[in-house]
Amino acid sequence: SHKLFTVYCRPVREKIRTMIEGFDDISHGGLPVGRTTLVSGTSGTGKTLFSLQFLFNGISYFEEPGVFVTFEESPHDIIKNAHIFGWDLQGLINDGKLFILDASPDPEGQDIVGNFDLSALIERLQYAIRKYRAKRVVIDSITAVFQQYEAVGVIRREIFRLVARLKQLNVTTIITTERTEEYGPVACFGVEEFVSDNVVIVRNVLEGERRRRTVEILKLRGTTHMKGEYPFTITNEGVNIFPLGAMRLTQRSSNVRVSSGVKTLDDMCGGGFFKDSIILATGATGTGKTLLVSKFIQNGCQNGERAILFAYEESRAQLSRNASSWGIEFEDLERQGLLKIICTYPESTGLEDHLQIIKSEIADFKPSRIAIDSLSALARGVSNNAFRQFVIGVTGYAKQEEITGFFTNTTDQFMGSHSITDSHISTITDTILMLQYVEIRGEMARAINVFKMRGSWHDKGIREYNITADGPEIKDSFRNYERIVSGAPTRVSIDEKAELSRIVKSFQDKDSSDASS
């Protein structure tokens, strides 16, 4: 059967893995072997870093020597900059695994005489490829060539000749080029993309008040790839792409329940939250969201589970003080190695960097529970699409690692119904707890409701909810009131005789069930 499959299966072009985090996912396995890829972007988008990482990973993971042709930076600067990421290029050069071909402008600024001709460079490059048996080549960047010479038509012809020679040598090549706009022509001189089999665009777009890095594969000739833009960040290990579209809903669904830390809330949820589920507590400020998060974290730690709390609105000291007033000692749990609290301002960095920090902390600490307080703080100043992608990234990674996540969301509306569908967060979460203020007989009261819980029975009632010195106290439903959610509850007139019979009957049912047990 295997032979039959081999005969009838359509051949797929062989690919070379870049080992750049996330890129091999969105490119369905890497770059086509022996082909040229154009990496285009505005200044500072990470083109040189991407291409250098492609070379370094080829040497590190596959023992594939590489050649780097530089038209802009000096070899000294390239080697120096690579040290930031822990890449010892000088050591690789000394070992004969990497060669940097310097085609950067003469610092003396000599006048250009005669016709433009890349023949000498092509011969030097061919010699280096054969001498070092290079499999990967980077040319950074051809825009510098166009800027030095005026004969654009001649340069195009020479670049085409260079690409053709590289194809003959069967090396996998990345050529970088500048563009002037984030969304516009692929490259400055309009035809660079036609001399390349593959085009990758990197962007650093200002969205709202923050910049957001994305990568898009425009084409991979003769093979498949994922469409659209994918967020990425630059860490101390290089480019890190988040292949959100490559995430598959393949995680196992657990029937195991975990406690919220509040007995009444567990009962309202049919026995607690499902393990590996994502819970969202949404409500106005002061409704008790952070308290529920604290009880959830405390319960996990009391059971010997590790937990991480990512806080974006309060400092560590403030969180510890508030938790202590409810009898929860965060500092003790941290000393025991069961809890890690990470506090940072949402505006301190972009969403992709926040996502990378969350993933990195989870990978290092290996918690069973995580909490984010709050998502709404992270949503400030970013587009709905960027925020949704962030939430998908966090929830997807938590489910992949089989972690129970508890997130909070602060609504703008102080009283009355509020939207929980902004940025479509509600569709991504498994359980939603709605917390709100209501006015009853001239006094403010809090209400809690299990708005949604996937795969489980849950209490549909809207219950009164108090915050005491011991934590949350959930009472009975607001019986005899309607329109609680609207924020303008009205008392329902009742038949006193019928209500008395209902109370008597409930006691009789309880007595009979106690007798039978």
Task: Name each model feature, range by range.
Residues 72-76, 84, 104-108, 143-145, ...:
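Conserved nucleotide-binding/hydrolysis micro-motifs of P-loop NTPases
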Residues 37, 113-194, 199, 291, ...:
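P-loop NTPase motor core
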Residues 34, 62-65, 96, 169-171, ...:
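Short glycine-/polar-rich loops that comprise or flank the Walker A/P-loop
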Residues 291, 297, 313, 506-517:
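Terminal-proximal interaction/regulatory segments of ATP-powered molecular machines
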Residues 13-14, 123, 127-132, 204-263, ...:
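Conserved P-loop NTPase
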Residues 62-149, 305-389:
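Conserved inter-motif catalytic segment of the P-loop NTP-binding fold
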Residues 26-92, 268-330:
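Walker A/P-loop NTP-binding active-site region of P-loop NTPases
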